[in-house]
Design a protein with these regions (language model features):
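Hydrophobic or amphipathic alpha-helical targeting/insertion segments
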Residues: 4-13
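Peri-catalytic substrate-binding/gating loops that frame the active-site cleft of hydrolases
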Residues: 1
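Catalytic cofactor-binding cores of redox enzymes
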Residues: 10, 22, 195
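An anion/pyrophosphate-binding glycine-rich loop and adjacent beta-alpha core
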Residues: 14-141
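Short, surface-exposed loop/turn segments at secondary-structure boundaries that line and modulate
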Residues: 25, 185-188
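A glycine-rich dinucleotide-binding beta-alpha-beta segment and adjacent secondary-structure elements
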Residues: 131-185
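Single conserved hydrophobic/aromatic residue that forms the stacking wall/gate
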Residues: 188-198
Length: 198
């Protein structure tokens, strides 16, 4: 009961690190001015998808009509060792930066392509659908395009507001005997205690 409805904080537990937000690089970008939020897609898509943009600024060409030599696989180019599997913050920053330079696609130029075609050719459509079936169906329902035929449009969006109860190295709050675990911690998405502040 103590953990519900901000109970620990109301009882004097210190709160820490509320100023950080985790950004998720694979969200469905806005489709119009009336869209109030971006839809989160799974990061697992970057395991099999290649992220790219047209090399031409403000390209209005359909992605399937853009030849390979006119595509910029910017994460693979900038980070050849990691490619599309760079950390979330890096993928998010690079996508935003390149879109701000005018290379973005879709509504307001706020999108990049996540293309599954190479993985479909390599592993087969059946394997890709087995891995991502629910995500592919959700994307098609929202966007109206089959992501196994047309590259997905993605863009970074806020995912997780960090901050929570302050803990010491033993994961105990400033309330004697109150230990804090999981996402109630004043940390990032993982359980790792913060440094004590004196």
């Amino acid at each position: 009961m103590l953990l519900q409805f901000g109970g620990p904080h109301k009882r004097g537990a210190n709160f820490a690190n509320p100023s950080f937000t985790q950004i998720h690089p694979t969200c469905i970008p806005p489709g119009g001015i009336y869209q109030s939020k971006l839809t989160l897609m799974s990061e697992s898509l970057r395991n099999d998808g290649r992220i790219w943009l047209p090399k031409k600024i403000d390209s209005k060409d359909d992605p399937e009509n853009i030849p390979e030599h006119e595509r910029d696989y910017f994460l693979e180019r900038q980070y050849p060792k990691y490619g599309n599997l760079v950390p979330r913050d890096v993928a998010s920053r690079r996508a935003r930066e390149i879109c701000e330079k005018g290379f973005g696609i879709g509504f307001g130029g706020k999108g990049v392509y996540l293309d599954l075609q190479d993985s479909i050719k390599k592993d087969g459509l059946k394997v890709i659908k087995a891995k991502y079936g629910n995500l592919l169906e959700m994307y098609e329902r929202i966007v109206g395009e089959d992501p196994t035929k047309v590259p997905m449009k993605i863009y970074p969006a806020p995912h997780y507001t960090m901050g929570g109860l302050w803990v010491d190295y033993n994961l105990m709050s400033n309330i004697d005997g109150l230990f804090v675990l999981g996402e109630a911690l004043s940390l990032i998405h993982i359980s790792e205690p913060t440094r004590q502040h004196h």
